[in-house]
């Protein structure tokens, strides 16, 4: 945390900063307190602990103070947080351990199995972001993907469709 404070403020740190830290929904009060203490020790003047779904709702431009429910699904790298937000807080929320990293790994496995193509996590993430889908799309999208042919060891390019990403992501989404 201290590294990021120094990185953001550089040498211009005249006053200790106010810092907001996001935590997954469902963390215990002890875990929140540990994050808060670590942030103070890193040099914060004030610390606000915000649950990730609430931060995601605010970031999406949702007025969280209104008396109507908004369902938020915040898929991070290691966890996915699902919450119903209303009147400035979470009505109900949960955090699951299936998230973006699992989707990337599923795409890597799919490319290896179906195309005999070795790709890295970065390429898998690019596929996920550009054409990834867990549901059938009205119009399929495609993209060219470069990797290493597992049979010849040479570079190889294949065209991958959103239907294939749907197939690749089926296993982690059903968990």
Outline where the language-model segments fall.
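Nucleotide/phosphate-binding catalytic cleft detector across ATP-hydrolyzing
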Residues: 1-75, 83-175
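Conserved Rossmann-like nucleotide-cofactor binding loop
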Residues: 78
């Amino acid at each position: 945390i201290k590294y990021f404070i120094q990185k953001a403020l550089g040498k211009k740190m005249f006053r200790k900063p106010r810092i907001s830290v996001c935590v997954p929904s469902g963390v215990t009060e002890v875990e929140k307190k540990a994050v808060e203490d670590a942030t103070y020790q890193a040099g914060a003047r004030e610390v606000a602990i915000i649950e990730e779904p609430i931060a995601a709702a605010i970031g999406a431009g949702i007025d969280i103070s209104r008396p109507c429910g908004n369902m938020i699904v915040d898929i991070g790298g290691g966890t996915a947080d699902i919450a119903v937000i209303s009147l400035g807080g979470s009505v109900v929320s949960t955090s699951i351990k299936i998230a973006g990293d699992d989707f990337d790994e599923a795409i890597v496995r799919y490319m290896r199995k179906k195309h005999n193509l070795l790709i890295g996590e970065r390429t898998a993430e690019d596929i996920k972001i550009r054409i990834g889908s867990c549901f059938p799309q009205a119009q399929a999208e495609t993209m060219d993907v470069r990797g290493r042919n597992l049979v010849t060891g040479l570079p190889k390019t294949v065209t991958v469709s959103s239907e294939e990403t749907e197939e690749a992501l089926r296993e982690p989404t059903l968990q």
